[in-house]
Every structure is written in structure tokens, then in C-alpha cells.
């Protein structure tokens, strides 16, 4: 009996350590009032993306859910309007596996929305296939699609600067290796899928790094955010059906809820004072160092050029900084600009809101300013 009690105590102690070090996510503070600002969140019909969109809506932002499924996207928008009390949550169709869909989304957004303050690339997949254009599906959805979308929306992001781009990455980037001669290589079998997934996560981190370099002094900053181990649809989607009932209780015990997974992306989108850390990788709401492959500026630029080619970007569609990226009358005291009043747009079912030194030391100062969590209850 004593042995059983001792064993139970050890198991409980081990779980407490796992819970506080892996499962429990630190809270996101940042700006509490986003009224008059607009955010786009991809893959926001479930999981981390939906919780991210919910918190943005609760803080008053106009939130565009960019999702592939119209049925699920509109249902999520309805849920979020009900939960947040904010009618400025809408759905717009976006399939990151299709370059044509990405361009159509950008055209529709730019023609109907007068501003963009926050762009969060949350959508992602973990298994592979081939798109109609014969692309590696993992590469297209996890990197090329977001890369193209960012480029197409940059004029709006620059016009609303200071603004932010957040790329939801993963600790899997540590296992990634990019073969620039075969970026679009076919992926066959689950082992290759695991490697290819890690490669796309490395691409996310390098993309954030190079984008920050390209947009230096424009007022647009970019961050790679690791949500942590999250119990989301992405985790169980490709698990055999017979195994899911066995894994669900375990996942509930040792993985974060989507609400916890949303904290670091929200931190990168909202925390004031982190602009000097643009291009860095965040986990648990603070900067983390990455392996050499993920901070290789030469590889990041090479990936940038290869991605332009794969995305079909022309010479005039690069992310070169504008000479005067911010208006002279901008007096925003916070890290995101105070928007000007907006007129309702014709394609929206709801009216637009009226506006109302040392790296370690720097990181410590930023962390000290984090406000208490606004709960996603």
C-alpha cells in the first residue's frame, strides 16, 4: 500500500512539473483596447486561430476570419460575435493551397477594408499531398501561401503602420533542413511528411527574420510565435480513428488548450515595446534563441528569393520599404497606430467601427511591462 501511495505521489509530482512547464501558458497582456483596428487571422474557424480571433474581438478589433470552408468560417464568425459581443467579426474565403485563392482574397480585402493593423498567419497543416498546380501541399499551405498573402497586403500594412505580422511557427523548426534545389519535392510516407513539416516550420522562422530585415524602418514589424504543445485539431486530425479515443485523455492532460496556445501569438500581436525584437522567435511570451540554421541570414534571403519564384511574384511585387512609410500626423502613443475614422465599406454586413542595449536586458524590461491576462472565458 505504501508503495502504491509513493508511486501515486511521484506521478502527481511529475504531472505538476509537466503542467507548469509545458501545459500552463503564460498570460498575454498588451493593449486592451483595439477599437478601430482591423486584424486578419487565417485558419480562425477552430483551435488556436479561433481563440486568437476571440480575444482580438473582445478587445474591440474588427476581425476577418480567413478560412477555406465557408460553412465553418461563417459558423465561427457567428460564434465569435455572440461570445465577444462584437459584431465586427466577419468571414472571408481563403484557400492557402491555391495561389489564385490567395490573390482573390487579397483583392477582395483591399477593395472592401480600408485598413489592416494585424496579420496573423495561423493556418497550417501537418500532412501532405499535391495541389492542382503540382506543389507540395505542406510547403504551399504552411509557407508559400502566407508568403504571397503578406506581400499582397503589404501596401495596407504600411499605410497603417505601425502594424504587425505574426507567423505561427513551431519548435519543430529545430529539426528542419531546407534543400533549395528541391523545395517543392514530392513527399511520400509519414516519415517524409514529418521531415517536410519541420522544414516548413523552419521556413516560417526564416521568413519572419527576412521580412523584418526587408521592412526595417517601415513601421511594420514581424514575429515568429510558437504556441507550445496544443491539443488542437491539427494534433488529432491525422491520427487513425481507432487510436483517437486513447489519445484524447492523454492529450487533455499533457497538452495546452487552444486558449493557452493563443497566448504567444497574441503577445506578439499586442505587446507594446517589442518592436526592437522584430524578426525574432517567441515562445511562452518571451524571446527564445534558435539554432544556427534558423538565424542564417544568407539562407533566409535565399528562401525569400526562392519563395518569390514559387509564389509567382513579379519584379514589382517585392517588399521594398517606402520612402515615407508613416504619415506625418501620426501621434499614436502605443505600438499600433491610432486609426482615423472610417466609413462603412460596401461589402461588409456590419458597419465599420468609428475610431475612437543588450538583448537580454531589453527582453527583461519588456517582460516586466506585461499586464494581467484578459481571460478568454
Swiss-Prot record:
Composition skew (Acidic residues), residue ranges: 317-331
Entry EC number(s): 1.1.-.-
Compositionally biased spans, kind Basic and acidic residues: 368-377
Coiled coil regions, renumbered to chain: none
Assigned keywords, A-Z: NAD, NADP, Oxidoreductase, Secreted, Signal
Protein residues bound to substrate: 170
GO molecular function (one): oxidoreductase activity
Family matches, as Gene3D superfamilies: NAD(P)-binding Rossmann-like Domain (3.40.50.720)
Signal peptide: 1-25
Region (Disordered): 309-377
Function: Putative oxidoreductase.
Family affiliation: Belongs to the short-chain dehydrogenases/reductases (SDR) family.
Listed name of the protein: Dehydrogenase/reductase SDR family member 13
Organism field: Homo sapiens
Amino acid at each position: 500500500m505504501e508503495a502504491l501511495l509513493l508511486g501515486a505521489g511521484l506521478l502527481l509530482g511529475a504531472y505538476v512539473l509537466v503542467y507548469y512547464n509545458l501545459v500552463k501558458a503564460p498570460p498575454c497582456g498588451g493593449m486592451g483596447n483595439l477599437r478601430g483596428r482591423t486584424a486578419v487571422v487565417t485558419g480562425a474557424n477552430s483551435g488556436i486561430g479561433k481563440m486568437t480571433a476571440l480575444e482580438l474581438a473582445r478587445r474591440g478589433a474588427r476581425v476577418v476570419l480567413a478560412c477555406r470552408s465557408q460553412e465553418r468560417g461563417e459558423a465561427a464568425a457567428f460564434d465569435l460575435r455572440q461570445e465577444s459581443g462584437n459584431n465586427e467579426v466577419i468571414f472571408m474565403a481563403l484557400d492557402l493551397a491555391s495561389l489564385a485563392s490567395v490573390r482573390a482574397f487579397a483583392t477582395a480585402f483591399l477593395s472592401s477594408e480600408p485598413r489592416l493593423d494585424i496579420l496573423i498567419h495561423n493556418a497550417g497543416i501537418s500532412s501532405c499531398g499535391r495541389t492542382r498546380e503540382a506543389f507540395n501541399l505542406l510547403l504551399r499551405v504552411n509557407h508559400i501561401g502566407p508568403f504571397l498573402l503578406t506581400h499582397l497586403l503589404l501596401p495596407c500594412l504600411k499605410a497603417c503602420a505601425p502594424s504587425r505580422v505574426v507567423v505561427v511557427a513551431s519548435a519543430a523548426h529545430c529539426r528542419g533542413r531546407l534543400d533549395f534545389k528541391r523545395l517543392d519535392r514530392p513527399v511520400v510516407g509519414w516519415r517524409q511528411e514529418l521531415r517536410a513539416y519541420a522544414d516548413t516550420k523552419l521556413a516560417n522562422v526564416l521568413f519572419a527574420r527576412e521580412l523584418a530585415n526587408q521592412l526595417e524602418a517601415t513601421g511594420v514589424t514581424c514575429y515568429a510565435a510558437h504556441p507550445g504543445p496544443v491539443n488542437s485539431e491539427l494534433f488529432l486530425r491525422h491520427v487513425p480513428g481507432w487510436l483517437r479515443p486513447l489519445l484524447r485523455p492523454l492529450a487533455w492532460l499533457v497538452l495546452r488548450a487552444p486558449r493557452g496556445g493563443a497566448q504567444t501569438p497574441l503577445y506578439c500581436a499586442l505587446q507594446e515595446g517589442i518592436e526592437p525584437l522584430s524578426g525574432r522567435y517567441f515562445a511562452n511570451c518571451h524571446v527564445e534563441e534558435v539554432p544556427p540554421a534558423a538565424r542564417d541570414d544568407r539562407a533566409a534571403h535565399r528562401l525569400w528569393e526562392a519563395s518569390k519564384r514559387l509564389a509567382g511574384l513579379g519584379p514589382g511585387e517585392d517588399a521594398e520599404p517606402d520612402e515615407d512609410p508613416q504619415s506625418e500626423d501620426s501621434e499614436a502613443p502605443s505600438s499600433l497606430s491610432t486609426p482615423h475614422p472610417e466609413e462603412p465599406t460596401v461589402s461588409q454586413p456590419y458597419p465599420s467601427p468609428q475610431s475612437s542595449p543588450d538583448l537580454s536586458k531589453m527582453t527583461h524590461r519588456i517582460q516586466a511591462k506585461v499586464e494581467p491576462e484578459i481571460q478568454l472565458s
